[in-house]
Amino acid sequence: VPGIEPSIKFPIHFGTSGFRGRWGVEYTEPVVRTITQAICDYLLEDGLAGKIVVIGYDSREYADIAAEWCTDVVLGNGFAVHLTSRDTPTPALAFYAGEVLAERSAGVINCTSSHNPVEWHGIKFSLRDGSISPPRVTDFISERSTAYQRSELTHAPTKQDPGHPEMVDPREPYCQWLLDSGETDCRISLDHNRMRSYFADKLVIVDEMHGTGRGYLRTILDIIGVPFQVIHAERDPRLGGLRAANPEEPHIQLLKETVAKTGAVLGLGLDTDADRYGIVDRGGSYIEPNAVLAMLTRYLGVERGLTGCVATTYVTTHILERIAADIENNDSFRPAPGSLPMHRRDPDYKVVRGAPDGMVTRNVFTVLTGLKYIIQVPQMARDYTLLDDPPPDWRCRLLIGGEQASGLTSKGHVPDKDGIWASLLVLDMVAYFGTSLQEIWRETQSLYGGSITAPINLTVPDKHKAPFIDSYLDAGRDGRLAGMAVVFAGGIPGKYAELMLEDENGNTDNFLHIRPSGTEPLIRVYLETSSELAMNALRAKIDEDAAAI
């Protein structure tokens, strides 16, 4: 196997989704063992010695080998290991640790780089309940890993008889757990009979993208009785030639074409580790995650009358604010009046125009990008203050949480992204309304106001990222951008910027957010406008600025 020669020493950044690197370049055996030892150090310092570490991996080439390296280190540190017998979805690992092992669990190590291109690999750590690691944990792992790198302590102390891992496959219990959702707990229930009846004479296409989700939706749809057809159904360590197994445009062309060609009413896509979803409506129309989140919030909160916090990242559609205002008996799950989101309280946050209270949401909790921040919301007071001792049922305080990048979880569910569960919620919603997603979205916009959203990914050299972001803060100071007046501009210099703009008609429902990707060599720009004219003007400005680099 290539890539196991000694690696070049470099600081290790272990972020929201762990560590990611290219096989044989940044991602090598010494690096994986070093990070795993740092994780073990954290677990030992947290008093979890001797408990079970769940180790899984995704379907890409060599990921299973990386999982074996992790297993060696974890066993050498005296922990028991439950190693998955096949590539396994991230949410299924979270379920297994939090629901099956429960108090016996120490945490989850997952060898995945999620939706990234095939040459990229990753290692991610989740807490013993399946939660995404918060910053205090990822910072510890980063600092300890880098310290090991500098001192060349890259291997674990080995026990005399470390033992062997127990092989597990959580697919069957996880699928049954989803089917039983809401029957005996606070989770959201699915109406199997209505789904079976509505889809009886219809077809659903499932795009497994050669990933870990193979067989999961198939099992569940079979049991419910929903007719389906599967594409990209085989495990392919090279992901079938896909540039990235990422269920969004332009990577889901075959799903769009198959839905259109077969006359299917719905297409459901999963990424490599099945934590992201991709939705295609009849005729082959891709549905943006922002629209999916808005429709599900309407369905669950307004139509079904379920209550709980609605949590989203600050780059998600503002139509959510208007929908969440319509959820009855939900006042105790709304932000306290006038409370600022945590990212705008950061001492490095600079307001260059306007007042931050002009960007405050009254019905939706807004946080930084990443599910790890979304799952903090039900662990907060209404003023965004993190509780030292969250209530035991904190997961039940969330109604729905999601982000523009196809990540979603809901009331009582695993505290991580789950593309399989998101797909089932969409199926349940479509059966409830009895029509296409495009029609549901048109009706939602007619009720709550229209919005146009566009995510833009720009490849920008590292040395130009901070100046590029700061140029939009400068535009905020100047007071105009793309022919529109800047009402508000703020952010952390070099890290991100957010702007609210007023068009010539006096409409201020126009927003620009810009930040570097935490996992890819990209700058992400998110636009939301009230008109095509404003959208076209902003896109032209972004294109012009990118071309000038």
PLM segments and residue spans:
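Conserved phosphate/anionic-ligand binding catalytic regions in large, soluble enzymes, centered on
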Residues: 12-25, 113-114, 208-212, 216, ...
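An N-terminal, well-structured beta->alpha segment
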Residues: 1-72, 76-77, 163-204
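Active-site nucleophile and cofactor-binding loops and adjacent substrate-binding regions
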Residues: 81-91, 286-289, 312-313, 365-369
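Gly/Ser/Thr-enriched, mixed-charge loops and adjacent short helices
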Residues: 2-9, 121-259
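Phosphate-binding and adjacent anionic-ligand microenvironments
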Residues: 120, 265-266, 306-549
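Buried hydrophobic positions in well-ordered alpha/beta secondary-structure cores of metabolic enzymes
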Residues: 17, 55, 93, 109, ...
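N-terminal small/polar loop signature for handling phosphorylated ligands or for N-terminal nucleophile
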Residues: 49, 54-120, 219-279, 346
